[in-house]
């Protein structure tokens, strides 16, 4: 639906929201259900409506609790029966500068202003701590937008008596708290208001007439921003950017104009635009976005263009380069298959509207922003919110390297006729560990990012993972895989809750980067042996179907589990007699 893509079609979003909701629910019959509490310092009904729409397009169906008008602090500090019974998965504190109870004046001393700043910050910090203690779920907090007037003009931003200066300093305190607390996230309305236009955003009519924190037409932009954070937390980010070449990464057509005729680099304004876009793409790579090329070109010409002396991107920045005369939708499908990623993990960037339309029609799930003018490419991708970062792991920072290693493995496989011999040639070592503190962040990240090889799709915060690790009733294991081509890092997670002599597997997932390598065999062998050592006689496994995890529907059957129950929605329960388990003995060394 184009109304959700930048630039947002606010008229459709606001006026046809009921129809949009029906259509989105029809498109995704198995959404992820989440409870979101909105604690507002202003009217929040439209915020909830728009946030619900944006989350639905990410496959998340939200149920909302909304505080009464301006009761955000009271609900957080003193609670309500309704909020307590709601048990939110996420709390969004929707406040703005009008919720500050004190602002400096020229009559205040700098000491008084500092004390005022501390008091205003303490008002919020105390609330965040109370929410963490009671609910232990992620909290999203607006920072503060600026008032749409400056009492002292330009001096307002640097003079301690200025409201703009005070709000800027208070925002910095919010950011310091966010940096120190892993489940706390800032929704940057300071940026959103500037991007939208502060005068329009802060139109006082909407505050005094309706008690909206911003103008009505800005609420979809606010909702898109909050939804981007939430979908990132639940693993709904895009993972890959697939790029055309001619008139996308450089100006001109390399096959016609030659490398010397391309517009790229500092010599001409057009070349500067493309160089800046290449720099942006390279920066995306640095935060874990994988890059690929899908271009109608001869491969030699494509590589020559990517080696242009004034270019920023080089061939080894890409995990796949499809430069040929095949249809681009077919190339993209091939890239997805090679990387073991679903099509909905991709963003396709191409200057040609005809190519964009074909890919959008033929490859459901891929995001296809309407690139219009090279000077707008960065803006279109950035405002799309495709790659919102809520956490960065070491694996994210070396994602391209990991995929290059997989390409080397694929080349090695081609030289073997026997798959077992190929696996032996990889010289693999699996290290199976408890949920140790060093791995907590990565484990939590995997639970929220893994969709295909994920039997229960249980999404966990770092605190959830710690709680499992510290509970003696839980048997928790994570697996790391190393071979002669490199270190894949933590790639698989299992967790089971023991009740008597039965172990219930609540969590079982694996990164698709290591499919068909035997890592699941190593984990099952280890898990069963460890369970037996704890006196477990029966292991129960659970499969909950989603739109993406059909590949593991019969996973437990392959290990000798017996299906004992199947629900109408396809959910299944399996049981294993531990004494009868036959170890798989995968083609790898297993270390503990």
Region locations from a protein language model:
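Extracellular glycan-modifying ectodomains
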Residues: 1-242, 249-250, 255-261, 354, ...
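Terminal substrate-recognition subdomain of acyl/acetyltransferases
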Residues: 338, 360, 364-426, 529-592
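A conserved beta-strand-loop-helix scaffold within acyl/acetyltransferase catalytic domains
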Residues: 431-511
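Conserved Lys-Pro-Asp/Glu-containing loop-to-beta segment of HAD-superfamily phosphomonoesterases
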Residues: 332-353, 359
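Acyl-donor binding region in acyl/amide transferases
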Residues: 484, 490-565
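Substrate-recognition element of Asp-dependent hydrolases with the DxDx(T/V) motif
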Residues: 272, 276-307, 455-460, 464-465, ...
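Short hydrophobic/aromatic-enriched beta-strand-loop microsegments
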Residues: 61-64, 317-320, 365-373
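Basic, amphipathic juxtamembrane/active-site segments
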Residues: 254-279, 364-371
């Amino acid at each position: 639906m184009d109304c959700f893509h930048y630039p947002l079609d606010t008229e459709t979003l606001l006026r046809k929201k009921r129809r949009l909701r029906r259509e989105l629910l029809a498109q995704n019959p198995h959404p992820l259900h989440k409870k979101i509490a909105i604690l507002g310092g202003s009217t929040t009904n439209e915020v909830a409506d728009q946030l619900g729409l944006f989350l639905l397009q990410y496959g998340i169906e939200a149920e909302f609790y909304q505080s009464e008008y301006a009761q955000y602090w009271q609900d957080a500090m003193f609670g309500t029966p309704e909020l307590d019974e709601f048990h939110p998965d996420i709390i969004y504190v929707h406040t703005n500068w009008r919720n500050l109870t004190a602002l400096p004046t020229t009559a205040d001393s700098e000491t008084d202003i500092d004390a005022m700043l501390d008091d205003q910050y303490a008002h919020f910090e105390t609330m965040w701590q109370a929410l963490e203690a009671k609910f232990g779920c992620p909290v999203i907090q607006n920072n503060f937008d600026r008032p749409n007037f400056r009492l002292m003009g330009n001096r307002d931003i640097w003079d301690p008596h200025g409201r703009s200066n005070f709000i800027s300093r208070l925002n910095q305190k919010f950011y310091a708290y966010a940096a120190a607390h892993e489940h706390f996230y800032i929704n940057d309305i300071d940026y959103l208001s500037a991007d939208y236009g502060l005068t329009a955003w802060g139109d006082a009519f909407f505050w005094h007439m309706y008690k909206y924190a911003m103008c009505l037409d800005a609420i979809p932009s606010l909702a898109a921003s909050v939804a981007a954070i939430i979908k990132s937390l639940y693993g709904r980010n895009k993972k890959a950017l697939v790029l055309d070449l001619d008139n996308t990464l450089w100006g001109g057509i390399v096959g016609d104009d030659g490398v010397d005729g391309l517009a790229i680099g500092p010599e001409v304004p057009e070349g500067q635009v493309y160089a800046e876009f290449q720099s942006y793409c390279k920066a995306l790579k640095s935060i874990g976005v994988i890059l690929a090329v899908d271009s109608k070109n001869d491969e030699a010409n494509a590589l020559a263009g990517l080696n242009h002396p004034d270019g920023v991107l080089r061939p080894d920045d890409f995990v796949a380069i499809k430069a040929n005369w095949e249809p681009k939708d077919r190339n993209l499908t091939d890239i997805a298959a090679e990387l073991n990623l679903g099509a909905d993990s991709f963003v396709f960037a191409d200057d040609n509207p005809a190519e964009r339309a074909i890919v959008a029609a033929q490859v459901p799930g891929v995001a296809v922003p309407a690139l219009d003018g090279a000077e707008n490419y960065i803006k279109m991708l950035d405002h799309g919110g495709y790659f919102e970062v809520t956490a960065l792991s070491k694996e994210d920072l070396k994602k391209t390297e990991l995929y290059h290693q997989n390409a080397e493995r694929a080349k090695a496989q081609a030289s073997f006729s026997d798959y077992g011999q190929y696996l032996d040639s990889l010289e693999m070592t699996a290290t199976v560990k408890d949920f140790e503190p060093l791995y907590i962040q990565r484990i939590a990240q995997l639970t929220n990012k893994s969709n295909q090889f994920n039997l229960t799709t249980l999404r966990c915060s770092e605190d959830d993972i710690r709680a499992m690790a510290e509970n003696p009733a839980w048997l928790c294991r994570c697996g790391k895989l190393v071979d002669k081509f490199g270190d894949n890092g933590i790639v698989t997670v299992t967790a089971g809750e023991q009740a008597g002599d039965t172990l219930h597997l609540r969590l079982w997932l694996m990164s698709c980067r290591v499919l068909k390598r035997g890592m699941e065999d190593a984990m099952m062998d280890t898990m069963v042996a460890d369970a037996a050592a704890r006196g477990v006689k029966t292991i129960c496994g659970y499969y909950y179907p989603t739109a993406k995890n059909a590949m593991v529907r019969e996973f437990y059957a392959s290990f000798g589990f017996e299906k004992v129950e199947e629900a109408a929605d396809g959910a299944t329960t399996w049981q294993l007699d531990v004494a009868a388990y036959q170890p798989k003995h995968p083609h790898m060394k297993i270390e503990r």
